[in-house]
Amino acid sequence: ARGGVWFWPRQFTMNNFKEVFKDGSITTAYVITIARTVIGTFLSLMVTTLAGYALKQEDLPGRKLITMLITFTMLFGGGMIPTYIQYKNLHLLNSFWVYVVPSLVSVTYLLMVRTFFEGIPDSLEESAKLDGCGFFQTYLKIMLPLSKPVIAVVGLYTAVNHWNDWFAGAFYVNDTKLWPVQTVLQQMLTKAMNSQQEVTSVAQALAHNTVSVTSDSLKMAAVVVTTVPILCVYPFVQKYFAQGAMIGAVKG
């Protein structure tokens, strides 16, 4: 009997993608995902660079203690239940901001940014202060323009993390209209893999020599739908990526 697995596709079809976009919620999910990626990345870069520049100051009171406490959070986490309770007390559950606020600062990226700032000559900062620049003016006019490589790397990693995250939507948001695209597709794939109609549909498709949508083909279509948009961002930051990652790795 002829099987359903072929080395070459028997027929070109877009049915897999039609199945992915058949549910209108995918469009809303894309809007939520794009919004959380843009807003979350921008706010995260702002907070991370400000905190990194502050920790770079050698005259900051308790600088070593603050750094030690921040690093401590990399080794020990609070766990899911305490995190859920904390989000509930902060009124973040079932809210768009549950995607943004908890991920404002990543310790790894913070230390990377601080290390990069420490590599900038102090003479530039001192010259800015002699010209009358304060903390924020020096940060905006001196530090940020010189930090494009590390900002590009941190921004790309943060954007990818926001784009790929399905966990927050699945566990902290009950309103399906606030789900990101990853959560929607994860639920869609779960239903497709558990569907008892798949074997029947494949058998009918083989009998009529047509193309059927299976859980595997739907999974591959979902992978394309979710990865292509974020891949389009990479060429714009590629020239900064290697330089910034190398600096963070060598000096971190």
Predicted regions mapped to residue ranges:
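A hydrophobic, multi-pass inner-membrane permease signature
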Residues: 1-252
